[in-house]
C-alpha cells in the first residue's frame, strides 16, 4: 500500500535493463512508491556472444508492471502516464504479422559483429560514419547487429525487404507490445535510442539513407523516430490492457540518457556517471554537436516534445559492476557483491596490483576490441584483498580517463560528478573516485535515476510536471565525497594504471 503522505496521482516507469526488467511507481516529488523487478536469462552461445530472449523479456515486463501497480495499491485512474527506459543498442528483429522474434536479441555487449565492423571500415577506418552519427564503427551499436541477423537468418533479408520484419531496440519492442502488438502496435523509437543505431544522422535527427544502405539495413524495417517525451500511444490489449488500458505511453530514453535526465543535468557542462553492469558517463553539451577527438561518443542527450534536441558527450566502460559479479561467481573470492567493500577496506592500498577488466575489449577512450583482461604488478605480497581493491580502483581509473577526455573535447573542467547506479552504495569506491578525479562526487536521494528520468519525461509529456525547473526542485543530495589524496600519489598511481592498460592491447590477433 502507498504511504499516507504519497497521495496520487502517480507516474510509472519501466526499465528494461541488461539483467532484469523492473517497474517503479513515482509520486509528484519524484519519490519511489513501489518497485517490482524480475531477472531474465543471459544466453552465451559462444565466447563473446550474448543474447536475450525477447519473448521472455516482454512476459517479465508485463509481470513487473502489474506487480508494481499492485504493490502500490493503486488503479489505472491513479496513473497519469508510463515511461520507458531501456538497455541501449540491444537489437531485435521480429515478424510484424505474428509478433514473434526471428532470433534472440543481440545484446549490446555481444561482439560477433567485429569482423563486419572491420569490413565496413576497410578503406576509411573506424570513423567512417562518425561525422553523421557521432559513433565509431564498433560491435557495440545496433546497425551492424541488424545486418548480421539479415545475413545469418535464412530468408530474413527477403522478408525484411517485403516489409514483413520490424527492427527495434528494446524501447521499440516494449512500446510496440504495450500499444497493441500485432493489433496496431506503434512502431516507434526515440531520438536517444535512434542515436545508438549508427543509422541516424545527428544533424537531421532522421535515418540516414546512405548509411543504412552502406551498412545493408533496409529502411522499410526501421521505426519512426520521435522525441523522448511525447505520447506515442496508449496501453492496449493483452494482460496489461485489462489492468491499465488507456494509460498514455509517453516517454522513451536509452538508460544512460534517462539517468542524465533523472539527475536533472539540464545545463551545458553538467555530467553524471552511472555505475551498473558497465559504467557510462554523459556530459550535457547543450545544442552543440561536439565531435570527439578523444575516443568519446557524440550522442543525443534528450529531446522534450518539439523543443530542440540536447546533445551529450559519452564515455562508456564495458566492465565495472560485472567485474564484481565475476569475482563472486567465477572466482569465488567473495560471496556477495557487497562483501567486496569489506574485503578491499581491510588493506590500505592495492599492494602494487592493477586490474584492467578488458573482458570484451576496451571501450572509451580506446575502442580496442583486440584487448583482453590483465592483472599487472603481481608479487607474492598481493592478497585477495589487494585484488578486491584493484577491482574497485579499475572502475575509478576508467572514469578518470573519461573525464580527462571530456575536458579535452569540450574545454569544460569537471566541477563535480553526480553518480547513480547500484555500485554507488559502495562508499570506498565513491571515496576512491573522488580521490582519483580530484573533484567532489555527489549521490542523490533517489539512486534509481534511470527510471526516474523516464518518469520525469513521461510526466512532462502529459503535463504532470510543468517544466524542467519543477524537476530540478525535486533533486536532493544524499551523500557527497571530497578528494583526500596527495597529488603526487594520484599522478604516480595513474601512470601505473596507464601502463597496465597498455599491457591489455593486441592480445587477440586479427583473424584474417
Swiss-Prot record:
Enzyme Commission identifier(s): 2.7.1.30
Pfam families documented for this protein: FGGY_C, FGGY_N
Chain residues that bind ATP: 18-20, 277, 321, 325, 422
Tree of life domain: Bacteria
InterPro entries noted in UniProt: ATPase_NBD, Carb_kinase_FGGY, Carb_kinase_FGGY_CS, FGGY_C, FGGY_N, Glycerol_kin
Catalytic activity: glycerol + ATP = sn-glycerol 3-phosphate + ADP + H(+)
Annotated positions binding sn-glycerol 3-phosphate: 18, 88-89, 140, 255
Sequence positions that bind glycerol: 88-89, 140, 255-256
Any one Gene Ontology cellular component term annotated for this protein: cytosol
Keyword rRNA-binding: no
Record flagged with keyword Lyase: no
Entry-linked Gene3D superfamilies: 3.30.420.40
GO biological processes: glycerol catabolic process; glycerol metabolic process; glycerol-3-phosphate metabolic process
Keywords associated with the record: ATP-binding, Glycerol metabolism, Kinase, Nucleotide-binding, Transferase
A GO term for molecular function: glycerol kinase activity
Activity regulation comment: Inhibited by fructose 1,6-bisphosphate (FBP).
Pathway, per record: Polyol metabolism; glycerol degradation via glycerol kinase pathway; sn-glycerol 3-phosphate from glycerol: step 1/1
Annotated ADP binding sites: 18, 22, 277, 321, 422, 426
Enzyme class: transferase
Function of the molecule: Key enzyme in the regulation of glycerol uptake and metabolism. Catalyzes the phosphorylation of glycerol to yield sn-glycerol 3-phosphate.
NCBIfam families: glycerol_kin (TIGR01311), PRK00047.1 (NF000756)
HAMAP family in the cross-refs: Glycerol_kin
Similarity-based family: Belongs to the FGGY kinase family.
Protein name: Glycerol kinase 1
Lineage: Bacteria, Bacillati, Actinomycetota, Actinomycetes, Kitasatosporales
Amino acid at each position: 500500500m502507498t504511504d499516507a503522505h504519497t497521495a496520487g496521482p502517480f507516474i510509472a516507469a519501466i526499465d528494461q535493463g541488461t539483467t532484469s526488467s523492473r517497474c517503479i511507481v513515482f509520486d509528484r516529488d519524484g519519490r519511489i512508491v513501489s518497485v517490482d523487478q524480475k531477472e531474465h536469462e543471459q544466453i552465451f552461445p559462444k565466447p563473446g556472444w550474448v543474447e536475450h530472449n525477447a519473448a521472455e523479456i516482454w512476459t517479465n515486463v508485463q509481470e513487473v508492471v502489474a506487480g508494481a501497480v499492485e504493490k502500490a495499491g493503486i488503479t489505472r485512474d491513479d496513473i497519469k502516464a508510463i515511461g520507458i527506459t531501456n538497455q541501449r543498442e540491444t537489437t531485435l528483429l521480429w515478424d510484424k504479422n505474428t509478433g514473434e522474434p526471428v532470433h534472440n536479441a543481440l545484446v549490446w555487449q555481444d561482439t560477433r559483429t567485429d569482423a563486419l565492423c572491420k569490413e565496413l571500415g576497410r578503406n576509411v577506418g573506424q570513423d567512417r560514419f562518425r561525422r553523421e552519427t557521432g559513433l565509431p564503427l564498433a560491435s557495440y551499436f545496433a546497425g551492424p547487429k541488424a545486418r548480421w541477423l539479415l545475413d545469418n537468418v535464412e530468408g530474413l533479408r527477403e522478408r525484411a525487404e517485403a516489409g514483413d520484419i520490424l527492427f527495434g531496440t528494446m524501447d521499440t519492442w516494449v512500446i510496440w507490445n504495450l500499444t497493441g502488438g500485432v493489433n496496431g502496435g506503434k512502431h516507434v523509437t526515440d531520438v536517444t535510442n535512434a542515436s545508438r543505431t549508427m543509422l541516424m544522422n545527428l544533424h537531421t535527427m532522421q535515418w540516414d539513407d546512405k548509411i543504412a544502405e552502406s551498412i545493408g539495413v533496409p529502411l522499410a524495417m526501421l521505426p519512426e523516430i520521435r522525441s523522448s517525451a511525447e505520447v506515442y500511444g496508449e496501453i492496449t490489449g493483452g494482460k496489461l490492457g485489462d489492468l491499465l488500458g488507456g494509460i498514455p505511453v509517453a516517454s522513451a530514453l536509452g538508460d544512460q540518457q534517462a539517468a542524465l535526465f533523472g539527475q536533472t543535468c539540464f545545463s551545458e557542462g553538467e555530467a553524471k556517471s552511472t555505475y551498473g553492469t558497465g559504467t557510462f558517463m554523459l556530459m550535457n553539451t547543450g545544442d552543440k554537436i561536439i565531435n570527439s577527438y578523444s575516443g568519446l561518443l557524440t550522442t543525443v542527450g534528450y529531446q522534450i516534445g518539439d523543443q530542440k534536441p540536447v546533445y551529450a558527450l559519452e564515455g562508456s566502460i564495458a566492465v565495472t559492476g560485472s567485474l564484481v559479479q565475476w569475482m563472486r561467481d567465477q572466482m569465488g573470492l567473495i560471496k556477495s557483491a557487497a562483501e567486496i567493500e569489506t574485503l578491499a577496506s581491510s588493506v590500505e592500498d592495492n599492494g602494487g596490483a592493477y586490474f584492467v577488466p578488458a573482458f570484451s575489449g576496451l571501450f572509451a577512450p580506446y575502442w580496442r576490441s583486440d584487448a583482453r583482461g590483465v592483472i599487472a604488478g603481481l608479487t607474492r605480497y598481493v592478497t585477495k584483498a589487494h585484488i578486491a581493491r584493484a577491482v574497485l580502483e579499475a572502475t575509478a581509473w576508467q572514469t578518470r580517463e573519461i573525464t580527462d577526455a571530456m575536458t579535452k573535447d569540450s574545454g569544460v573542467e569537471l566541477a563535480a560528478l553526480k553518480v547513480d547506479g547500484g555500485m554507488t552504495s559502495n562508499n570506498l569506491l565513491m571515496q576512491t573516485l573522488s580521490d582519483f578525479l580530484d573533484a567532489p562526487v555527489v549521490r542523490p536521494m533517489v539512486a534509481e535515476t534511470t527510471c526516474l528520468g523516464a518518469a520525469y519525461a513521461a510526466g512532462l509529456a502529459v503535463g504532470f510536471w510543468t517544466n524542467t525547473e519543477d524537476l530540478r526542485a525535486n533533486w536532493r543530495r544524499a551523500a557527497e565525497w571530497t578528494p583526500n589524496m596527495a597529488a603526487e600519489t594520484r599522478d604516480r598511481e595513474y601512470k601505473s594504471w596507464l601502463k597496465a592498460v597498455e599491457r591489455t592491447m593486441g592480445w587477440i590477433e586479427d583473424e584474417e
